[in-house]
Amino acid sequence: MRTNPTTSSPVVSTLEEKNLGRIAQIIGPVLDVVFPPGKMPNIYNALVVKGRDTVQINVTCEVQQLLGNNRVRAVAMSATDGLMRGMEVIDTGAPLSVPVGGATLGRIFNVLGEPVDNLGPVDTRTTSPIHRSAPAFIQLDTKFSIFETGIKVVDLLAPYRRGGKIGLFGGAGVGKTVLIMELINNIAKAHGGVSVFGGVGERTREGNDLYMEMKESGVINEKNIAESKVALVYGQMNEPPGARMRVGLTALTMAEYFRDVNEQDVLLFIDNIFRFVQAGSEVSALLGRMPSAVGYQPTLSTEMGSLQERITSTKEGSITSIQAVYVPADDLTDPAPATTFAHLDATTVLSRVLAAKGIYPAVDPLDSTSTMLQPRIVGEEHYETAQRVKQTSQRYKELQDIIAILGLDELSEEDRLTVARARKIERFLSQPFFVAEVFTGSPGKYVGLGETIRGFQLILSGELDGLPEQAFYLVGNIDEATAKAMNLEVESKLKK
């Protein structure tokens, strides 16, 4: 059994009880601190710099290196403006600890676990240190089980693993945020789970927009904050690298509590995992490490591993992680995305071409992949249906150039049938979302995996060849598509 979180945070009580050091050097976000002999803090201990006299300064740092000669090197979690050599530094005697549990839901926190949403203080009776070891082998749940999202294209073609890690690839404006919000909504409704969102080094405006959209869609319940389905932890682009480097761990620590103590299924969103690596590379040289390939930190794999290995299923519950991955200059061989890929179980690729056609969620059925899509895991029926959907979509893609030049009439009868079915499949992969109801006016749909498979089998078998393709656009299950086709027929007769 893992140790429970502490029920009191390491508060700096009186100066006499704590180790006191003094700042010896400041280089940007990195501080060197001298402590008395024999009173050195441990690696990862939190240090607090207090201002002199009337100056209100309260900067928290984290010990990264013990340099010898009673000096330690620490990374600041907030701006070091106004700090001077000789200032007193207090060793708290423990790592950074953050509030965990139900009190975190519906609130926004910074890397230190302090609320930043102007909604008053948070109950901090239960806190947990952000540095913990990954669960032991004996605690892991190694069964392969599908994490049903209720989103047709995901469940059929690139299913998520319960306790797995999913990479979310997509440019600006293709629907990443809406997809993330729908997943948060569906895990709460279908799995009774909660979500934690870690905003790592992204734009402050985007963080604010996400918060506002979550309030609009009901994911954050303003009237009764305790009924919210998500906790938000932000370390945005304007924060020092120390905060961006640790904010992912703060979010993960909150998620671990829901998994280990509340025994819930948790969704952990990290947006963006690349910024976590980038923040580490910013301080790496200041910490005196030799850079490795492309200037990244030599500890890149270790840092990534220590975060990713804590994201897993245990016998108590699961943390399923969805990580937005920025690919610098679209170079997939760059060490940062390449290291991330090694940890992913599935990839969900969002396509601008599909978004332009108005097909939402704009998940690319051919580029998205999953290690779960194997007959021994998902079953023969699911696997066969998914493969046939992909084959039909691939054939349609190959024929598009011919159609553009010569037109549909020049295709063989068989190819014309394939194109017609592929267009129905493309539209049936779209789906109305609960969180988009306020914008679209059409009620959201949660489609179970069995219903999804049945629908695509009917399209592939040719039973629905007589229905118009627009009947399949933005519907839930296949019965809704047939009902919509009948309505369209009635409408067209009335017009005549």
Curated annotation (Swiss-Prot):
Record's keyword terms, sorted: ATP synthesis, ATP-binding, CF(1), Chloroplast, Hydrogen ion transport, Ion transport, Membrane, Nucleotide-binding, Plastid, Thylakoid, Translocase, Transport
Any one GO molecular-function label of the UniProt entry: proton-transporting ATP synthase activity, rotational mechanism
Function: Produces ATP from ADP in the presence of a proton gradient across the membrane. The catalytic sites are hosted primarily by the beta subunits.
Family to which the UniProt record says this protein belongs: Belongs to the ATPase alpha/beta chains family.
Family annotation (NCBIfam families): atpD (TIGR01039)
Oligomer status and interactors: F-type ATPases have 2 components, CF(1) - the catalytic core - and CF(0) - the membrane proton channel. CF(1) has five subunits: alpha(3), beta(3), gamma(1), delta(1), epsilon(1). CF(0) has four main subunits: a(1), b(1), b'(1) and c(9-12).
Protein name: ATP synthase subunit beta, chloroplastic
UniProt organism field: Trachycarpus fortunei (Chinese windmill palm)
Lineage, broadest ranks: Eukaryota, Viridiplantae, Streptophyta, Embryophyta, Tracheophyta
